[in-house]
């Protein structure tokens, strides 16, 4: 069976080669016949018409001669008619002389070139002598003799062109018939070879036809499913992005109101209630942040910074705001950096977000024991890497789920962890950030014992000139009794909350809902601080800020501080940034607002 198959394959190859060679020859003949502009020119002649142009000149020559006879015999004494026919004759001859497809065609023929050159000299004589006949009509007969002497050459030139055209058409038509016959014969041979080839191919692959159809159907179904999946992912990302951004404004009212309450004296019972509200709001804010970050990472190409980063202080900054949750769950947390003064060149914000998400994930799924965060330098001097590890004694992850935990919205469907808050986006964000830094993340986990996430990132060691800034940030004020602020936000809850937060900082606040109202209020009392929403219903926050800047002198001793806020981070990328002193995404926290005001007003 294999010998027959091998013989069939050799026959197929031989017949296929013959058919390809024959088809190439057939295609060349067909292209030579129909596809080239040279053959088309030979068949049709120039598109302007060789004989037609010469015939027009002959007709004009005849009319000029007849008009000149009438003038010479005084049958028509109007000399303008002679000049009119001369102009017509010159125009007709101009078509012969001027560079064109036609002139290029016949000037390549020696006889035609010589005749046209002689007629050109004769036309020059006519242009010189004929205008003088108006005053000396008696010279008309001499000119008529010259015209009559050149008439045979004009007539012969037209007839010559006609003969050339006819001869070329006959020759080309003969070639056309010969090539057509060759094409038909070669096509017949190719058809026979192709038929034999197809029969042999059908005989060889008849058992594979059904399988190929099934495979094609499966590929089509997969492609359609893939297209639908991409469309659904794009629609989902757009929807989730919109939802996450729309949640930021009500979160501003929730978080801000809670922090204002916490800034006031409260009873123990009220404090417990407010703390529960704060924890729930923080959980909701974290979920919205994860969702927004993931959509932003998937929708845009994030630029990665490379600045000196002190790892120990960075990880301490990650751990400090989470110590309250760690303490509430009675966990122990440790931090180790090797070497302790490790400084690398990388993107500080991305590393901080990676570490923060991993630590928060461990806190969620660890009910007792420890959470250990470590960072160490690894690799070789030419290929430095940094490993950040977060190890916990939590519930652990089953092996069959390790490949899924970095998928968006994935949550372990286990009774022991169903109570854990979250939408399954924290690790998906980690994966996207690690990829952005050209690193990778590994997971080791045992159910009931805990998990360890190890992030490996390529880094560089900074030189002496790249040392991080050791200057301590300025101390923040807690009250600003002498300041007067203007809050412009179309959302009433957010506006009232921002006003209450400023009041909690000791700042008097005026509240307005539109850009025009805000400008009117600022015109009545130039404020020290303007908290301005970028998306206002009448005019944009950028326009409001520009008008405020125009209304105040840049040399004034008391310059107005303008703070731009928005639920949409993309809105902060538009407009003129120079008119704002700072941008803050919603929700704004009280300590953040206090820090910004202190820094900008110091």
From Swiss-Prot:
It holds the Pfam family HisKA. It is an enzyme of class 2 (transferase). It is a multi-pass membrane protein. Residues 242-461 form the Histidine kinase domain. GO terms for molecular function: histidine phosphotransfer kinase activity; phosphorelay sensor kinase activity. It catalyses: ATP + protein L-histidine = ADP + protein N-phospho-L-histidine. The keyword Thylakoid does not apply. It comes from the Bacteria. PROSITE patterns: HIS_KIN (PS50109), RESPONSE_REGULATORY (PS50110). The keyword Cell membrane applies. One of its GO terms (cellular component) is plasma membrane. Disruption phenotype: Increased production of thailandamide. Inhibits growth of Salmonella in an overlay assay. The modification 4-aspartylphosphate is found at residue 533. It is found in: Cell inner membrane. Its EC number is 2.7.13.3. The modification Phosphohistidine is found at residue 245. The chain crosses the membrane at residues 11-31, 182-202. Thailandamide is a polyketide that is toxic to human cell lines but also has antibacterial activity on E.coli, S.typhimurium and S.aureus. It probably acts on acetyl-CoA carboxylase in the fatty acid synthesis pathway, which is rarely found to be an antibiotic target. These data suggest it might be a good starting point for engineering of novel antibiotics. Member of a two-component regulatory system involved in control of gene expression; inhibits synthesis of (at least) the polyketide antibiotic thailandamide. Its two-component partner may be BTH_I0635. This is Sensor histidine kinase AtsR.
